[in-house]
Amino acid sequence: MEEGIDQRLIEKELYAQAEIRLKNQNYSSAIISLETLESRFPFGRYAEQAQAELIYAYYKNFEFEAARSSAERFINLHPRHPHTDYAYYLKGLAAFTDDAGLFTRYFDSDLSRRDIEPAQTSFEDLSEFLSRYPDSEYASHARQRMIYLRNLLAQHEIGVALFYMERKAYVGAIGRANYVIEHLPNTPLTPEALSILIKCYEIIGYEKLMKENLEILRLNYPDYVSTNILVRDKKSWINRLSFGLLGGEKIPMPKKR
């Protein structure tokens, strides 16, 4: 009896210790406390809450693969738990993370050579989260993040299209521009995609398609001015594509259940 009481006290103290460390943003130490709590008391009073908070702690400690693995484990163990939406949400965020500095470096590099797969994975994971939990308290932020990711994916396709144009691979450029219009609609890149189509069709002699896309551009983007296609100030691109979603994001901890 006394041993059982002692074990419960140890469990409670470990969890309290983890909470203090999380509150103080000492994420490395919090991870140690939460991992210890989970391993020593896998079926204890705080086990499921600790598992959810561990996802958060890994994420805040920039251990994004560990955050995704922990989220997937939580989903598999607790498919109907009140925190399962949180696990899906963090899993999506952890697939592709950055800040304003990284975003700027992204645009400093050759977009046609960048690995866009993490952004695509994040977009797909967040899409799954929203399809499962459209009314989740985390849904609003997930939708904002998906707008940002859609813009980033569209910019990548435009970068590849321009890469092809520089090498006179106009069919490839047309394919990338069409992909933006058909699969990544309603982004700031749509007029640039149309502009690329107009230029490519003009070069290869497809006058009818050139005129059709020019008319679409004029009707839908009357204020758009194309100067040598995509000659833009870098800060302007960052502001247009990020919608202020970069930097300063406050990712919430899972609520106590």
Sequence positions of predicted segments:
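Acidic, polar-rich low-complexity tracts and alpha-helical solenoid repeat scaffolds
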Residues: 1-257
